Amino acid sequence: MAGILRLVVQWPPGRLQTVTKGVESLICTDWIRHKFTRSRIPEKVFQASPEDHEKYGGDPQNPHKLHIVTRIKSTRRRPYWEKDIIKMLGLEKAHTPQVHKNIPSVNAKLKVVKHLIRIKPLKLPQGLPAEENMSNTCLKSTGELVVQWHLKPVEQKAHES
């Protein structure tokens, strides 16, 4: 570049314009990584509407307590803050369900990565299992948590005759 500028200074003024046009074509900015910026999406987009409840099901008066969250898309070529949230939610491995509470702090994180995940409500047809029954539970692909009850052996009473 210094050699080109030295030639420009030595040349007559008429040739200066043709050389500067050639220098502009040499400068290419395609290799520069442009900075990611957060999208400025208005908050009203994230507010629930009655049409959403009709479309996706659910009752706004009695919301479910737990979410089943599954990552369905890759985090490659995604911004760093989306990768951080995926790691916070424990969704590094794809198609592995994670259970999260339905609270505002968790929901705010889920909104940021909602295009990468699938969210289903956790249905408890037999109610919330006790601590001793947690090892006997099975999570179905439909989103139901089924408690597998084990039969206890009946004690035989001795008959005296």
Curated annotation (Swiss-Prot):
Keyword tags: Mitochondrion, Ribonucleoprotein, Ribosomal protein, Transit peptide
Lineage top rank: taxon: Eukaryota
Gene3D superfamilies in alphabetical order: Ribosomal protein L30, ferredoxin-like fold domain
Cell location: Mitochondrion
UniProt entry tagged with the keyword Plastid: no
Gene Ontology cellular component list: mitochondrial inner membrane; mitochondrial large ribosomal subunit; mitochondrion
A single MF term (Gene Ontology): structural constituent of ribosome
InterPro entries reported for this sequence: Ribo_uL30_ferredoxin-like_sf, Ribosomal_uL30_bac-type, Ribosomal_uL30_ferredoxin-like
Keyword Ribonucleoprotein (UniProt): yes
Transit peptide region: 1-34
GO biological process: one example: mitochondrial translation
Summary of subunit composition and partner proteins: Component of the mitochondrial large ribosomal subunit (mt-LSU). Mature mammalian 55S mitochondrial ribosomes consist of a small (28S) and a large (39S) subunit. The 28S small subunit contains a 12S ribosomal RNA (12S mt-rRNA) and 30 different proteins. The 39S large subunit contains a 16S rRNA (16S mt-rRNA), a copy of mitochondrial valine transfer RNA (mt-tRNA(Val)), which plays an integral structural role, and 52 different proteins.
Family: Belongs to the universal ribosomal protein uL30 family.
Protein name (Swiss-Prot/TrEMBL): Large ribosomal subunit protein uL30m
Upper classification of the organism: Eukaryota, Metazoa, Chordata, Craniata, Vertebrata
